[in-house]
C-alpha cells in the first residue's frame, strides 16, 4: 500500500519535472524516471509481463528519440531548475498540488474515480477442468482493445504526430 503510494508520488513529481524542464536533457531524464516508476506501479499490481513489456518498448523508443534530440539540441550552458524564478514557480505549484491531493485522499479516502467494465466473460480467460482464471495482464490488454479501442487509436496517432513534431523541430 505505502510502496504504491510512494511510487504514485514519484510518478507525479516526475511529470512535474517534465513540465518544468529548462533544458531538453532534463526533460528526457524526467521521462525516463517517470516511465520506470510507472512500470514499477504496473508490476506492483501484478502485471509483471505488462510492466516489463512497457518498460522495454517505452524506454527503448524514448532513449533513441531523446538521445538523438539531445545530441542535436546541446547547449553549452544548459539552464537548470534553479536558474529561473518561473521554473521554480511551476515546480512548487506542482508539488503543492501533489500535497493537496495527498491531503485530500488521506482526509476523504479517495476521489471515487474509476470505470467498471462489464462483460469480462468474453475476454482472455484461462480455463481448466477445475475453473477459470483471469490474469491482470491479459485483462488489461483485452480491455484496451475491446472497450477502449478509441484510446489505442488516439495514442498511436499522438505518437505519430509527436515524431513528426520532433523531426520538424530538430531539422
From Swiss-Prot:
A GO biological process held by the record: mitochondrial electron transport, NADH to ubiquinone
Main function: Core subunit of the mitochondrial membrane respiratory chain NADH dehydrogenase (Complex I) which catalyzes electron transfer from NADH through the respiratory chain, using ubiquinone as an electron acceptor. Essential for the catalytic activity and assembly of complex I.
GO cellular component assignments: mitochondrial inner membrane
Protein's recorded name: NADH-ubiquinone oxidoreductase chain 6
Reaction(s) catalysed (UniProt annotation): a ubiquinone + NADH + 5 H(+)(in) = a ubiquinol + NAD(+) + 4 H(+)(out)
Transmembrane segments: 1-21, 25-44, 49-71, 85-105, 150-170
Family listed: Belongs to the complex I subunit 6 family.
Subcellular location field: Mitochondrion inner membrane
The entry's keywords: Electron transport, Membrane, Mitochondrion, Mitochondrion inner membrane, NAD, Respiratory chain, Translocase, Transmembrane, Transmembrane helix, Transport, Ubiquinone
Subunit structure: Core subunit of respiratory chain NADH dehydrogenase (Complex I) which is composed of 45 different subunits.
Gene this chain is encoded by: MT-ND6
InterPro entries the UniProt entry points to: ComplexI_Subunit6, NADH_UbQ/plastoQ_OxRdtase_su6, Nuo/plastoQ_OxRdtase_6_NuoJ
Molecular function terms, GO-annotated: NADH dehydrogenase (ubiquinone) activity
Amino acid at each position: 500500500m505505502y510502496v504504491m503510494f510512494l511510487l504514485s508520488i514519484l510518478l507525479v513529481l516526475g511529470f512535474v519535472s517534465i513540465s518544468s524542464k529548462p533544458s531538453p536533457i532534463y526533460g528526457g531524464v524526467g521521462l525516463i524516471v517517470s516511465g520506470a516508476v510507472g512500470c514499477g506501479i504496473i508490476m506492483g499490481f501484478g502485471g509483471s509481463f505488462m510492466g516489463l513489456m512497457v518498460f522495454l518498448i517505452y524506454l527503448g523508443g524514448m532513449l533513441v528519440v531523446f538521445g538523438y534530440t539531445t545530441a542535436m539540441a546541446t547547449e553549452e550552458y544548459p539552464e537548470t531548475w534553479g536558474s529561473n524564478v518561473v521554473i521554480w514557480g511551476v515546480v512548487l505549484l506542482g508539488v503543492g498540488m501533489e500535497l493537496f491531493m495527498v491531503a485530500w485522499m488521506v482526509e476523504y479516502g479517495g476521489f471515487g474515480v474509476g470505470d467498471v467494465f462489464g462483460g469480462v466473460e468474453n475476454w482472455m480467460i484461462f480455463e481448466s477442468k477445475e475453473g477459470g482464471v483471469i490474469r491482470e495482464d491479459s485483462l488489461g490488454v483485452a480491455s484496451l482493445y475491446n472497450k477502449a479501442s478509441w484510446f489505442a487509436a488516439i495514442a498511436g496517432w499522438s505518437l505519430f504526430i509527436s515524431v513528426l513534431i520532433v523531426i520538424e523541430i530538430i531539422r
